[in-house]
Amino acid sequence: MDYTSYYYYGTENWSFCGESELTSAIDYVVSENLPKVYLLTGHGESSLSDSFTSAVKQQNIETAELSLLTLESVPADTDCILINAPQSDISLDEQSKLLEYLGNGGNLFLITDPPKNEKLSNLEALMADYGVSTVDGIVVESDQSLYVWGTPYFLLPDIASHAITTPLTDGGYRVLLPISQGLTVADDLRDTLSVTKLLTTSSSAFAKAAGYDLTTYEKEEGDVNGPFALAVAISDTVDDGITSDIVWVSSAALVD
């Protein structure tokens, strides 16, 4: 099923044309009229859907693939790096190159799923440097108004007011995120950082430590209490008038 273009015509529209929201996120992290977005490769990243690729082209956004394994640094013409659902971790060398790029005012759009095999430790360490960390497991929602089809991990998160979410809130839409990982924001952010929780669960949500092997929707020992963020926008002031912007969404279904 294509979750990014599914609509429900009832008392409320709870899904949306996902490519519109994603291009809104890219527009947020880049300010150039004709931006160039590099798609990171080398870690089993998922291909972008045809509808999203078409929407990107309509926005005059140029895309190209990028392998940091073979380059000394991020190309100078990079307006944003998109990392889409990597299945394996980045190397420490790649982490260093990404940190250098972001530290100079670069922009990142990160889309992840709960890991199926290996933990993405280096990528998560990079994001922890920007005040956001993951919680192991798959998020299950207890509030019946925030999930669909009787499946508590098919989430309908609350939407915060933000430039990125304007296409949703103006249209009265809800976001459908099947299979998400919880994100938490550090309490002690450095002064240069600002983090906005774009999509959030209720306080009764929890993360099932069993992950993809879960056998019950009930809370068990080892599960972690929410609430969680499922998408965040991060802004880091790296110099006078220069910011590094990052958007992180913790469910790759957004671009399927």
Could you say what each language-model-derived stretch is?
Residues 1-256:
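Short, surface-exposed patches at the edges or C-terminal ends of soluble domains, predominantly
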